[in-house]
Amino acid sequence: MNTNEIMSTIKMIEEQKLDIRTITMGISLRDCCSFNGEESRKRIYDKITRYAQDLVRVGEEIERDYGIPIINKRISVTPISMIAESSDDKDYVEYAKTLDRAAKAVGVNLIGGFSALVHKGCTKGDKILLQSIPEALHTTDIVCSSVNVGSSKTGINMNAVKQMGHIIKDVANLSASTNGMECMKLVVFANAIEDNPFMAGAFHGVGEAECVINVGISGPGVVKASLEKVKGEPFDVVAETIKKTAFRITRAGQLVAREASKKLDVPFGIIDLSLAPTPAVGDSVARIIEEIGVEACGAPGTTAALALLNDAVKKGGIMAASHVGGLSGAFIPVSEDEGMIAAVKSGALNLEKLEAMTCVCSVGLDMIAVPGDTPAETISGIIADEAAIGVINNKTTAVRIIPAIGMGVGDSVEFGGLFGTAPVMPVSKFSSADFINRGGRIPSPIHSFKN
């Protein structure tokens, strides 16, 4: 490396807020099944604390040795519905508490995998887990839950979509004293992926190895700073600039992943190329979109700008990493992005425009607060719309929505830390009840039949 490259990397970290958002250790719990729930939970606790005992220490060592901030150390596990259904337990709240205790024992920030994959239907374990979600999230601190309700191969399980609307409302009501904040630990997916290092949707897929290290990068501020140097240039130049910047960002992630894998003696899984914003000024995906040329995020042209950004990040990042996976693109979580928050407050960005943006970006409607009296059927309708985008376009989509109990449009929910502030956004006043109450399954699209 020449001196300019070294100085450029230092500048990315110190001035442009480049960081490694997460080192996530995925752990298989498939050998923790037992007909006795207590025995199963003991095996789960012992395995997590054994495999992850050095995760935080190693993350801090790498941060110190290389000077790259590593914001979170996390764990993902096999979906608990698959593990717990071997037992005769009638609810799985104790499994969530076990995950919580194990994660706290090793010092990680979050643990994901209180999850169920119900895109075609529910097993006994899936049904019990879904019923357990509200109490599980209410009685734990750092456990995250996810449910996959659709896939491009199987269509959309509308029975599960209906149920998730009610579950989200139940979670919100149990945390009414904090305006429904516990909902930020729950995400509903279509086309969920098995190697996601980001929360709340991370789980360790059944096709994964015994234990792996997945790394999620960040760096919206670096991309914006690069684009400031090409003001007024054609889109070709914009795309090339983003690609080159994404390459540099991803190289840092590859270095951290390789070192973590070596020090922990755990196989390297993937680098997730996602641009993950924070509420801090200068670390916003919305501000990148505005730098590309729209006056405010949400104005006409926003979706096209986001599509360009997402594609260029993938093209640049994929050349810098040996294995790419996860969600890999640009995140647009409203409460976690200073520019998104400003756009919503100014009226430039609404729920419908956000839905359009999810057609071309990494995930979906993320960290969105809606009025606390929003009907469960309306929430289910929002989930169904987002799932349809994912299923038809063969991409991952998701909904992480917070019914802000006791709040209305114009109020704001304060989450604090990386979770930021969510302005309460208006939703349609027209009912989706008759649509949601049909139940059944929406069939998979014609182009899903590829065999």
UniProtKB/Swiss-Prot annotation:
Q: Which residues form a coiled coil?
A: none
Name the CDD domains on file: RNR_PFL_like_DUF711
Tell me the InterPro entries matching this sequence.
UPF0210
Give the matching SUPFAM superfamilies.
PFL-like glycyl radical enzymes
Q: Which family does it belong to?
A: Belongs to the UPF0210 family.
Q: How does it assemble?
A: Homodimer.
Write down the NCBIfam families for this protein, in alphabetical order. Answer: PRK05313.1
Q: What is this protein called?
A: UPF0210 protein CA_C0479
